Regions:
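Active-site core of glycosidic bond-cleaving carbohydrate-active enzymes
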Residues: 7-16, 20-37, 41, 45, ...
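Long, well-ordered core segments of solenoidal/helical folds
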Residues: 50-66, 152-163
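Catalytic cores of extracellular degradative/oxidative enzymes
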Residues: 1-22, 32-33, 38, 42, ...
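Acidic/histidine-rich catalytic neighborhood
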Residues: 53, 57-132
């Protein structure tokens, strides 16, 4: 369920972002989009097992949020010019060690916005598909549905905000001190990256 996602027209590949494990969710999202466009229940019934297999991968891969403390290794923090920040665990499920598709100079982190939003979208689509097809037509047990509902309830949705502190200047990339930002990272602040 993980692939190299940087494939060119000439069939060559790149290992940039080679830990892009959420690619499977990206691919299965197109199955749901096809259903939404066509309303073809026969297609949805064929697509459902693929979407469910993808969800099972994430049931095993997601971890309970472990929080983050940039001050644990003070020498490393200073060497990388990382600001001091700390987040306590919040009890949600997060995708471990993912990268943000829009940022290239920050390390991977648990619970990036892109990964979390895609995974939550998959779980929501499956819940909707069960409602459309009827649980009896999906091959799922009541335990399977309960597990999906648990993950749907406890998975971090990938929507976090912060207030820009002005640490890179009063205005940085058009953002003014005190303005609210939508985060790409669950923990790392806006000013962590030069991208």
């Amino acid at each position: 369920w993980s692939v190299l996602t940087e494939t060119s027209l000439y069939n060559s590949m790149s290992t940039w972002g080679d830990n892009y494990l959420v690619a499977n969710v990206w691919y299965t999202s197109h199955l749901w989009t096809h259903w939404r466009y066509t309303q073809d229940k026969e297609f949805l019934a064929k697509a459902f097992p693929v979407m469910w297999d993808c969800a099972q991968f994430w049931f095993h891969r997601l971890i309970e949020d472990r929080g983050f403390d940039s001050t644990k290794d003070e020498q490393e923090r200073v060497r990388n010019y990382t600001p001091a920040y700390k987040f306590d665990p919040d009890g949600t499920f997060v995708a471990p060690n993912e990268f943000s598709a829009e940022q290239h100079d920050n390390q991977t982190e648990d619970g990036t916005a892109h990964a979390q939003q895609m995974i939550y979208y998959l779980f929501q689509n499956l819940s909707d598909a069960i409602g459309i097809l009827g649980v009896e037509n999906t091959g799922l047990t009541t335990e399977d549905v309960a597990k999906l509902n648990l993950y749907l309830e406890k998975t971090d949705k990938g929507l976090h905000t912060e207030t820009y502190t002005g640490s890179w200047g009063a205005t940085y990339n058009g953002v003014k001190t005190g303005e609210k930002l939508l985060r790409e990272w669950k923990y790392s602040p806006f000013d962590i990256s030069n991208d």
